[in-house]
């Protein structure tokens, strides 16, 4: 995806606007019998924008209001069950950024989000939006983060407009050397399928090791264990992911 925007300060008042374009592509699914099925009906482009206004009431305290809107256009007009999945949606929220000390900063907000689908058989997907982030830096070498997010995710379950996903993440970064960083992360989440009895719980534990060969070249190794517990028979999954990547930057 890509983002283009601008930010303007008027003394204590700040205005920020961004335009966003994102592309989501799903890989083919491999079935237990050895065959595979494609997920091309789930691929979509998203076009949208977000605007935020904020005002610095006190040093370290900046309340804000934010509004976002987007449209999602799928590669295929109908999904595998002949539902029209193109949609429009967005959110509105209010909150504040804060800095208690130089060691403890964060942001918290509450709002409302909704998504309407082209298919009249699908109900409007809506829900309470809560998001927060807290960053604690106990030492110059260690940073701890707590992050919670709410999102509306796509699904192909017949008659279900979408999935309301809430994630809660704890992450700790530690620099052993200037060139060696370790990252530990744990995530717990819930997925509620709207207009459906299905409900999932997500657990993920992850470890990363980042080796900074130079300012421009980083090598990253990752091991992750993902577990999904579902109240639907046969819907639970577990996976272990091992990745090795390279990051180039200027």
Feature locations, PLM:
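Extracellular loop and loop/strand-boundary signature of outer-membrane beta-barrel proteins
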Residues: 27-40, 76-83, 116-120, 154-158, ...
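Solenoidal tandem-repeat scaffolds enriched in leucines and small polar residues
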Residues: 2-83
